[in-house]
Amino acid sequence: KRQFLESARCHGELYGTSLDFVKQAQDIRKDIIFEVDWQGADSIKKFFKNAISIFILPPSLKKLEERLKARGQDSEDTIKARLSEAKSEMSHIEKFDYVTINDKFNDALEDIKVIIMAENLKTKNQMIHHNQLIEKLTK
């Protein structure tokens, strides 16, 4: 039995997304947000054809490095490795549906909210969520 929607090794740790959790959220028609690398996003899109993907870019590599150092959690070598991984991730940006730049957190968050709202308002999604109302109004 498949237990994970996607899994990946990142920074020496194994991460994954429980398929049961995703199915439960889907059953109650909840939007699901995943924080995954480009390979995870690719796996999710293969499993859920209507999934959308948003790539969150740093404003610059210098700013990303500053943020990693400010956390105070990683060694210099780990920070260098994370920056290298970030560059590799960014080389796959064209596979994503949307891009936002996380210069100011609240601005990036607002971008993400707008993207989700716009996707939910697409006709195909409204036809699913408001099927009875639409049928009643169009008959």
Regions picked out by a protein language model, each given a short descriptive name:
Residues 73, 91-139:
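NTP-dependent small-molecule kinase module
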Residues 24-27, 45-49, 91-93:
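Conserved catalytic network of the ASCE P-loop NTPase/AAA+ motor domain
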Residues 1-32, 38-42:
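ATP-dependent small-molecule kinase phosphotransfer cores
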